């Protein structure tokens, strides 16, 4: 028995000691070396005896015995014959398990090209031979000959010959040359490749060539050839002569009842190959006619293709049921493939699932577990306890007792469960809070009870949701569950750092009701000794809950030394608030409780508690708040009745007025005064305004009521209307929903997003008529359809994000960089979108922050900014801070803790080993389902914002203009002549309060540096037309303005004024094509006037559609408009919103009509125009001018002679992130992506920290393109990981060589995932075949750095608790002699069973996981 145990141990010790996985091409010899014998027959098993046929696909001699330790003929049975090979049937006596890993092989009668290297684009064989895929296919499938050895003839190598040409050549030259057909020909060509010589030639060619396309092509080919050279793969191995056969247990054949068999598709495919191969061998032996042999070879090629990748070429081979057979490639790719189905996600034992119900009496760390479930889940633990106590003699007896559910079993179950945490998971697990640990409480019934406060994290409700339970078995797993996953340790959300354990719904309503005050309630004005007395008064009915009273409150406040000091004061409060104060922990101020508590206030309260008192107190407080909230929600008796929906009296009046206005607009339309579009927009604006007015009247009506106070005078107070209370507290519902209940439903949208102009004037209390109901079905159904689509899309986005960021882990404490990104408050228009304190909270300062206006250091470099520092920033009114960021972090693999900053879910500097990439991906993906799917049309209600025509400031302060060029008109007002001018209002402390974009041609009433008062209008402009502003005074002279040729005259019927409209180039007659209509300004003598400060003449070219109202020779003053260009195109552009917008940003997609940016700084001019385009020329102060062709229909933001800076917008449109990166750098593109993504989430009210988006941006920027390689290992134009270039450059700097020059490249997340260094990770993501093909040809090595790779090979991940294990491994690798010491104590660590124990209990087998975890624990000890 002893040696059996040793033998078993040896068997289980798998080859786990590798650090790299290399993939390559298998040579024929390699395949033979794996093989245990050749499969010669297509037979599988004998259908009578069910024994495998000899030499067949399931042959026991090749693949091993069918029964454990028993040969096929039955001569040798039992363990004692282990290792004997039976002389009769030739089967080795061993475990059946070997049938899972012993391979066979098939000797192919002729070579066959591997379809992956042929058809997976770009074709590797094609690339290496430099032949088109078409040609190679014609050779392979026997349509043409290829010349393999031209000899002395005038044929060329690799030349294709048709049958006729081949015969002609043979007649002409005899056997001077060699030409072959089929895979043999291709193999011969590949074998003759001289890689070194080819590489040298390519390098020379690369030096000489100038054409960009040729360069790219050569680089591609060169990379492939070099990969072949370095990896030791030989090109001819891409053509197979030996085919490996998968072990039989991986392609099983199972007899069903009724004499039929269920089989894996692979067996059919292998059978086909063997049949054809054998037939071909026979034909070759018989020396059959060429055409027959060829046909057979072609069929063999096709059957091998189908085996490897069915359906890749031609039609897929189908089985008996018309379904394509599942080939080897299909086994590994896709959601059901090996990677995603079995390696990345496995099903686990010790789990159960059930419906969830509420457990309002539980503590936060508890959950209710049905007894039945617990008994089943903790079975083994119960068995072992029963046995060790001597209650049951054997495991079998224990099993019986448990099945009979004897009373003692329940006692033992309770003991086992004590302090054994379990994991609860609700699908879909969108972020890490979707799995949390709880301590089980045994309950009757069959539903799991869940604590109400963790519902937000799980996104659970109790309308039938189910949850899964998992039991952590090993000590280590229990430890992790308790220390890291316990619900009490996850109070803050990792996405935003705000509390996620926040009361909602009933609890909020209860607390809100409890803390409201009421005028003249019973007991008003009483005095109480302490909150206990106030409660007594309430319980005995002496005072109402809402009564305003004075209570003596004892607060415990921290003093300077940090000790709690008691302070007692008599304070104004209400009974309810005093009662609530009784649950407050010491150290919280009373003012936090002494207010009406809505949802936001409660969230703040818990946050405050967490920051002041720490985790434990906050969790206790949260629980107490919940119990109190439920109790008082029940007492409040708040409910919804139809009379609570009070319809405002003014409603009918408002609607009547709106209808009258609409009728008036319709009149105007009928008489032709307004266009159809204008009428539609105006009607929608009227109804939107009416809706607002009704809503306002309704809310005023609902939210306040008039009561008589103690003095007998009327006084307004907030109403106790149930519906209003629910919305006001944030418990349920919103003003928008109440508006539909008691106001009017308003405008509805069609499914395409356009707004129906007849609104629904009724509300739900009045009820809708048929027409109104019909209109509203549109929106409702669209909502449902959207939701279904949204879930799938959001899940896919999350998957892509996780994939791109999965290997980003905190690997060191400080990378030492001085770089960072500059943070300022986000201000749009007159309101601060996000204050500076919120943006820098939890970040590390990159360089000293100085006190504004002095040289004194306020915050030193490398300080982590916490709440206290934020107060300092506010007090000193700092408005710009440079903070460290993940994007600028210098760590090679991973990120450093200082560049990341605070761990949002814990509130301190992040620990090493934290998987920040995955957290970022989850934080961005999880709210994805809340984002909308639709694209917004600016139309009607939405366009109110777009049509601004003036700026009215909200704060007093000083005006500051940036990027401003202007002229002063005769009234002394300033007229802007620059494009992207920004107007900022700065307060007395120098803080930016407001920020506006001002368009070209706006008239400003204040200059730079002027003071403004609140509500002053500082700028106005015409929103519908863009003027052309004259920068000088003079006389107008028309140039190229010819009636009927370049312009048309229009006379306005109403006013009788005539104007000239410039025609578009496309609409002009041929004679007018080259004319360029312009207005020139001349002085009295007719000479050109120069624009001040330049030597450019003042002439203004007019684009198509421009309207000129002045006549030739008219006098004009400076700052007046020469012409106007109508801006009608603005109203129709779609704004992509919601989820698709986020996906577009992360995929770095180029928009349809991207903004055109200036590539260099210089002066703009226009060159010769072509048919549909105009030529833009930018001439810099020195160096080459830059030319670009721009389509005519693009509206340009620049006139001729204007000066632009590199990266300025020349033509409006959506900016392309690639352009921003190229022209403005990494910081600008980070800013752009972060702000754009945040914009979408902010609209939905979702809070995500910028850090997470930056993490993804870092991953999108991890590749660079080499622009100057010097003599390094890189090629120019090659795409390389930035970290690799940096490492190489550090080395080169030490050697004093010039540094390799590179440009950062922005990749979309899908591209970036596929371009990762690790081929295992890329293959398990998408396009498995392509990734594996590429990796195999290049002989890639996977260093197993990321998380996915390690999960796939079954290791601990190099993050979290596995981080130490991997560091220990790395240490061990560098000092091999200590390896023994590291391995030795493994067995003792967990007190694993000794040999004797195993003999007694033969059923127990230790698995690898427990061993590796034990090793992990030791790794920690050793360090």
UniProtKB/Swiss-Prot annotation:
Zn(2+) 1 binds at residues 71, 73, 86, 89. One of its GO terms (molecular function) is magnesium ion binding. Mg(2+) binds at residues 461, 463, 465. Binds 1 Mg(2+) ion per subunit. Keywords: DNA-directed RNA polymerase, Magnesium, Metal-binding, Nucleotidyltransferase, Transcription, Transferase, Zinc. It catalyses: RNA(n) + a ribonucleoside 5'-triphosphate = RNA(n+1) + diphosphate. PANTHER family: DNA-DIRECTED RNA POLYMERASE (PTHR19376), DNA-DIRECTED RNA POLYMERASE SUBUNIT BETA (PTHR19376:SF54). This is DNA-directed RNA polymerase subunit beta'. It comes from Actinobacillus pleuropneumoniae serotype 3 (strain JL03).
């Amino acid at each position: 028995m002893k040696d059996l145990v040793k033998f078993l141990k040896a068997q289980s010790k798998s080859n786990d000691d590798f650090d790299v996985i290399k993939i390559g091409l298998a040579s024929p010899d390699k395949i033979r070396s794996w093989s245990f014998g050749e499969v010669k027959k297509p037979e599988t098993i004998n259908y009578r005896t069910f024994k495998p046929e000899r030499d067949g696909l399931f042959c026991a001699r090749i693949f091993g015995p069918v029964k454990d330790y028993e040969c096929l003929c039955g001569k040798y049975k039992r363990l004692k014959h282990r290792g004997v090979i039976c002389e009769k049937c030739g089967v080795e006596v061993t475990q059946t398990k070997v049938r899972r890993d012993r391979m066979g092989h098939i000797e192919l009668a002729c070579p066959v090209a591997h379809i992956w290297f042929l058809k997976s684009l770009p074709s590797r064989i094609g690339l290496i031979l430099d032949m088109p895929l078409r040609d190679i296919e014609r050779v392979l499938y026997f349509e043409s000959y290829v010349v393999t050895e031209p000899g002395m003839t005038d044929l060329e190598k690799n030349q294709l010959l048709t049958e006729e040409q081949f015969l002609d050549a043979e007649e002409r030259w005899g056997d001077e040359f060699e030409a072959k057909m089929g895979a043999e020909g291709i193999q011969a060509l590949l074998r003759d490749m001289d890689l070194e010589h080819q590489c040298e030639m390519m390098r020379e060619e690369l030096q000489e060539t100038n054409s960009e396309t040729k360069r790219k092509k050569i680089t591609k080919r060169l990379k492939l050839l070099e990969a072949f050279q370095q990896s030791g793969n030989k090109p001819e191995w891409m053509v197979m002569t030996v085919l490996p056969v998968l072990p039989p247990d991986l392609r099983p054949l199972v007899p069903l009842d009724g004499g039929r068999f269920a089989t894996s598709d692979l067996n059919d495919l292998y059978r086909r190959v063997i049949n054809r191969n054998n037939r071909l061998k026979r034909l070759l032996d018989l020396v059959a006619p060429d055409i027959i042999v060829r046909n057979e070879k072609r069929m063999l090629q096709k059957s091998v293709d189908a085996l490897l990748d069915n359906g890749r070429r031609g039609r897929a081979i189908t089985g008996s049921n018309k379904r394509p057979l599942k080939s080897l490639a299909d086994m590994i790719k896709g959601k059901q493939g090996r990677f995603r189905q079995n390696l990345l996600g496995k099903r686990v034992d010790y789990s159960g699932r059930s419906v969830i119900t509420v457990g309002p009496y539980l503590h936060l760390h508890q959950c209710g577990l049905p007894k039945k479930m617990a008994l089943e889940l903790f079975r083994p633990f119960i068995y072992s306890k029963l046995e060790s106590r001597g209650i049951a003699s054997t495991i079998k007896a224990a099993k019986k007792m448990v099945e009979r559910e004897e009373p003692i079993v329940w006692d033992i179950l309770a003991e086992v469960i004590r302090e054994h945490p379990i994991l609860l998971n609700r699908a879909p697990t969108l972020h890490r809070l979707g799995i949390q640990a709880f301590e089980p409480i045994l309950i009757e019934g069959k539903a799991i009870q869940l604590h109400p406060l963790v519902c937000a994290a799980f996104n659970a409700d109790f309308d039938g949701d189910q949850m899964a339970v998992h039991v952590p078995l090993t000590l280590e797993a229990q430890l992790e569950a308790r220390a890291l996953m316990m619900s009490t340790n996850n109070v803050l959300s990792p996405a935003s750092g705000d509390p996620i354990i926040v009361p909602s719904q009933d609890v909020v309503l209860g607390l809100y009701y409890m803390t409201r005050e009421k005028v003249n309630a019973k007991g008003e004005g009483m005095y109480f000794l302490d909150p206990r007395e106030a409660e007594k008064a309430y319980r005995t009915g002496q005072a109402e809950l809402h009564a305003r009273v004075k209570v003596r409150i004892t607060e415990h406040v921290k003093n300077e030394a940090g000790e709690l000091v008691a302070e007692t004061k008599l304070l104004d409060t209400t009974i309810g608030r005093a009662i609530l104060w009784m649950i407050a922990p010491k150290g919280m101020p009373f003012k936090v409780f002494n207010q009406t508590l809505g949802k936001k206030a409660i969230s703040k309260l818990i946050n405050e508690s967490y920051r002041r008192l720490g985790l434990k107190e906050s969790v206790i407080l949260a629980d107490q708040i919940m119990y109190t909230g439920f109790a008082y929600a029940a007492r409040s008796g708040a409910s919804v009745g139809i009379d609570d929906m009070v319809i405002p009296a003014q409603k009918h009046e408002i609607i009547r007025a709106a209808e009258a206005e609409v009728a008036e607009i319709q009149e105007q339309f009928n008489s032709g005064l307004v266009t159809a579009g204008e009428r539609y927009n105006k009607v929608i604006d009227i109804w939107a305004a009416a809706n607002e007015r009704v809503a306002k009247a309704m809310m005023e009506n609902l939210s306040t009521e008039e009561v008589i106070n103690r003095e007998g005078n009327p006084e307004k107070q907030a109403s106790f209307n149930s519906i209003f209370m629910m919305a006001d507290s944030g418990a349920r519902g919103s003003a928008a929903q109440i508006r539909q209940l008691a106001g009017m439903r308003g405008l509805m949208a069609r499914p395409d997003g356009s707004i129906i102009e007849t609104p629904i004037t009724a509300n739900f209390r009045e009820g809708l008529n048929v027409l109104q109901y019909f209109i509203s079905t549109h929106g409702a159904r669209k909502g449902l359809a959207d939701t279904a689509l949204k879930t799938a899309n959001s899940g896919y986005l999350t998957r892509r994000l996780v994939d791109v960021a999965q290997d980003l882990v905190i690997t060191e404490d400080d990378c030492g960089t001085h770089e960072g990104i500059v943070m300022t408050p986000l201000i749009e228009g007159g309101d601060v979108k996000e204050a500076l304190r919120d943006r820098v909270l939890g970040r590390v300062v990159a360089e000293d922050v100085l006190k504004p206006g002095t040289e004194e250091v306020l915050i030193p470099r490398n300080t982590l900014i916490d709440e206290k520092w934020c107060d300092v920033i506010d007090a000193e009114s700092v408005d710009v801070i440079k903070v460290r960021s993940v994007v600028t972090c210098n760590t090679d693999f991973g990120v450093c803790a200082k560049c990341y900053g605070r761990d949002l879910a814990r509130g301190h500097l992040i620990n090493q080993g934290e998987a920040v990439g995955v957290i970022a991906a989850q934080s961005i993906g999880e709210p994805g389902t809340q984002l909308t799917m639709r694209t917004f049309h600016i139309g009607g209600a939405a366009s109110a914002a777009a049509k601004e025509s003036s700026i009215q400031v909200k704060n007093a302060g000083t005006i500051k203009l940036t990027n401003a060029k202007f002229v002063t008109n005769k009234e002394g007002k300033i007229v802007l002549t620059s494009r992207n001018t920004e107007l900022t209002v700065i307060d007395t402390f120098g803080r930016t309060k407001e920020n506006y974009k001002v368009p070209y041609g706006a008239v400003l009433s204040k200059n730079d540096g002027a003071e403004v008062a609140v509500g002053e209008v500082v700028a106005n402009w015409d929103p519908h037309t863009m003027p052309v502003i004259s920068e000088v005074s003079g006389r107008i002279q028309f140039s190229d303005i010819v009636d009927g040729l370049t312009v048309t005259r229009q006379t306005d019927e109403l006013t009788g004024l005539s104007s000239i409209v410039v025609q578009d180039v496309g609409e002009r007659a041929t004679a007018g094509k080259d004319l360029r209509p312009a207005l020139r300004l001349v002085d009295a003598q007719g000479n050109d006037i120069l624009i001040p400060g330049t030597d450019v003449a003042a002439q203004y070219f007019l684009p198509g559609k421009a309207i000129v109202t002045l006549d030739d020779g008219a006098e004009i003053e400076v700052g007046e408009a020469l012409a106007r260009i109508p801006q009608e195109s603005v109203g129709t552009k779609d704004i992509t919103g919601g989820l698709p917008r986020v996906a577009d940003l992360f995929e770095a997609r180029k928009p349809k009509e991207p903004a055109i940016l200036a590539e260099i700084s210089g002066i703009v001019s226009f060159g010769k125009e072509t048919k549909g385009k105009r030529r833009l020329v930018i001439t810099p102060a020195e160096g080459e001018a830059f030319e670009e062709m721009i389509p005519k229909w693009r509206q340009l933001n620049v006139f001729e002679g204007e000066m632009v800076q590199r990266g300025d917008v020349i033509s409006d449109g959506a900016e392309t992130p690639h352009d921003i990166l190229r022209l403005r750098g990494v910081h600008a593109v980070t800013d752009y992506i972060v702000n754009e993504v945040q914009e979408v989430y902010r609209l939905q009210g979702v809070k995500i920290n910028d850090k997470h988006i930056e993490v993804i941006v870092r991953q999108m920027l991890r590749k660079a393109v080499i622009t100057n390689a010097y003599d390094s290992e890189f090629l120019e134009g090659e795409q390389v990981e930035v970290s690799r270039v940096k490492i190489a450059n550090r080395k080169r700097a030490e050697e004093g060589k010039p540094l390799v020059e590179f440009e950062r490249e922005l990749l979309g997340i899908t591209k970036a995932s596929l371009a990762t260094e690790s081929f295992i990770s890329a293959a398990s993501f998408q396009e498995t075949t392509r990734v594996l093909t590429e990796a195999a040809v290049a002989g890639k090595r996977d260093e197993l750095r990321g998380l996915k790779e390690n999960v796939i090979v079954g290791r601990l991940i190099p993050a979290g608790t596995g981080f130490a294990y991997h560091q220990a491994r790395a240490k061990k690798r560098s000092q091999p002699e200590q390896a023994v010491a590291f391995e030795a104590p493994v067995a003792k660590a967990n007190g694993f069973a000794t040999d004797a124990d195993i003999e007694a209990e033969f059923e127990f087998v230790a698995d690898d996981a427990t061993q590796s975890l034990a090793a992990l624990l030791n790794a920690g000890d050793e360090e």
